[in-house]
Amino acid sequence: MGDKTKVQVSKLKPGRYILIDGEPCRIGNITVSSPGKHGSAKARIEAVGIFDGKVRSIVKPTSAEVDVPIIDKRTAQIIAMTPDTVQIMDMETYELYDVPIETGVADEIKGQLKEGINVEYWETLGRIKIMKIKGE
């Protein structure tokens, strides 16, 4: 799978995802300037990185195409925990992944993780992040 696709800037909406500088980001705000006498309308996109939490912004013509990541949302079970990594097993394919706690776990759930619970994780561009704890 290519893990990314192209989408026209005018089709983007807040809450969707975009690649900025090779980093998958969630769009927070889009402002579109009106076209001038000698130019096309421009869109200013402000987004927050999924993995690093940094705020990024870009300005592009609304007719331009940008890369959008394909995010695979799956369920896994926590098999083992070490001080700096979490080992998870996919519930469908039974593949094992080692996820670093610092960059691969959402801040809201870092203290709630324990062995044996099910979690939802996102995989995109060869990277994994545990996003939330799944209910039983």
Swiss-Prot record:
One of its GO terms (molecular function) is RNA binding. SUPFAM superfamilies: Nucleic acid-binding proteins, Translation proteins SH3-like domain. PROSITE patterns: IF5A_HYPUSINE (PS00302). Its main location: cytoplasm. It is found in: Cytoplasm. Keywords: Cytoplasm, Hypusine, Initiation factor, Protein biosynthesis. Pfam families: eIF-5a, IF5A-like_N. The modification Hypusine is found at residue 37. One of its GO terms (cellular component) is cytoplasm. GO terms for biological process: positive regulation of translational elongation; positive regulation of translational termination. SMART domains: eIF-5a. PANTHER family: TRANSLATION INITIATION FACTOR 5A FAMILY MEMBER (PTHR11673). Belongs to the eIF-5A family. Functions by promoting the formation of the first peptide bond. This is Translation initiation factor 5A. It comes from Thermococcus onnurineus (strain NA1). The gene is eIF5A.
